[in-house]
């Protein structure tokens, strides 16, 4: 059995689902009685979501709506890294939500070490912001996927296994 099997460990999300989520959030803000006249702005750029609104109460309501809609669209809540609340012009406040994507080098090393400590006959290589896990045994790979899913909780980043070969 010279054939080798592998999969990639990545930390990413479906950007289109996030865009759809924020469209639903904007629609709900414009229709909800308590949020309709608050001049709340929700905006998305490449790496952040910006929320500008009148009060902290409104901000908390918008954050709750974002979480609810993200869950319904199968987005992990771990992709959101909530920043501090800033006071902008006059009576407006702003919060920046950083979107976590990619596995940082030190976290990749922790994941790699953890997998190798528990499974001896497995190769883990770090390729930029992804990890490639390879083995000759499919059972070892299934065990590695289980280890990765357990690590996801302790590291507080969304991890997915894909590109099974």
Curated annotation (Swiss-Prot):
<dbReference type="InterPro" id="IPR035571">
    <property type="entry name" value="UPF0234-like_C"/>
</dbReference>
<dbReference type="InterPro" id="IPR036183">
    <property type="entry name" value="YajQ-like_sf"/>
</dbReference>
<dbReference type="GO" id="GO:0005829">
    <property type="term" value="C:cytosol"/>
</dbReference>
<dbReference type="InterPro" id="IPR035570">
    <property type="entry name" value="UPF0234_N"/>
</dbReference>
<keyword id="KW-0547">Nucleotide-binding</keyword>
<dbReference type="Pfam" id="PF04461">
    <property type="entry name" value="DUF520"/>
</dbReference>
<comment type="function">
    <text>Nucleotide-binding protein.</text>
</comment>
<dbReference type="InterPro" id="IPR007551">
    <property type="entry name" value="DUF520"/>
</dbReference>
<comment type="similarity">
    <text>Belongs to the YajQ family.</text>
</comment>
<protein>
    <recommendedName>
        <fullName>Nucleotide-binding protein P9301_05061</fullName>
    </recommendedName>
</protein>
<dbReference type="GO" id="GO:0000166">
    <property type="term" value="F:nucleotide binding"/>
</dbReference>
